[in-house]
Design a protein with these regions (language model features):
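Gly/Pro- and small hydrophobic-enriched strand-loop and loop-to-helix capping segments
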Residues: 162-165, 182
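Terminal amphipathic alpha-helical/low-complexity segments used for targeting or macromolecular assembly
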Residues: 1-54, 58, 132, 172-183
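Short conserved AdoMet
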Residues: 57, 146, 164
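Flexible, glycine/small-residue-enriched loop-and-beta-strand segment within the central core
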Residues: 35-46, 64-77, 81-146, 172-173, ...
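Beta-rich strand-turn-strand
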Residues: 137-161
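Glycine-rich phosphate-binding "P-loop"
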Residues: 61
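Acidic, glycine-centered active-site loop in nucleotide-sugar glycosyltransferases
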Residues: 165, 170-173
Length: 183
């Protein structure tokens, strides 16, 4: 039997409403935030995120250059941060815990395609970043991953499996480097 991928018959499972909200968001966010310096305008940015359904704490920090696919699937708790140029591809929910930081250029990816399906159907699973965790610059966090409390994902690491609390991981694929100890 010949194996064959048939994306010509792929069907987008996202609703028309979802697509329209995405279109409006794609226009609104850059227009509402392009003129703001990085350190200013946080209440304004939070307001826009909330208008599009995000659950975001008063002290959460989102840089204007952060890309958020679907605000209604974003929850940010107290003192959490999405830094500059973060790409939050949140087709499924992304939850960022208190005092957690996602550093510049990191990629949070809640969706992929089923490579065993000839139609490559979309598959999704949430990402949870627990309290006091840190995602390093340009790191990749894949769908379905939970980053434990206090864990650190090193710069440019690629995480495909859950990371235990108070653990430092790095590399591709990410491997445990050591336990994180706060002095």
């Amino acid at each position: 039997m010949e194996q064959r991928v048939d994306i010509a018959h792929y069907h987008n499972v996202l609703s028309r409403k979802h697509q329209i909200i995405r279109l409006l968001w794609g226009i609104a966010w850059p227009m509402a935030t392009w003129f703001l310096p990085r350190s200013m305008g946080m209440p304004w940015k939070r307001m826009w995120l909330r208008l599009f359904g995000a659950r975001i704490a008063k002290t959460a920090n989102v840089y204007a250059s952060a890309k958020i696919y679907y605000p209604a699937n974003l929850e940010m708790k107290e003192y959490s941060c999405l830094a500059s140029d973060v790409d939050c591809y949140n087709v499924a929910p992304v939850i960022i815990g208190e005092q957690s930081t996602v550093s510049q250029g990191a990629y949070l990816c809640t969706a992929s395609h089923d490579i065993t399906d000839p139609l490559n159907h979309l598959i999704t699973s949430p990402i949870v970043i627990e309290d006091q965790a840190w995602i390093g610059a340009k790191a990749f966090v894949g769908m379905g991953v939970t980053i434990g409390q206090g864990a650190v994902v090193g710069a440019t690491a690629s995480v495909y499996k859950n990371v235990e609390s108070w653990t430092v991981v790095g590399g591709n694929p990410a491997k445990v480097i050591k336990k994180r100890v706060i002095n």
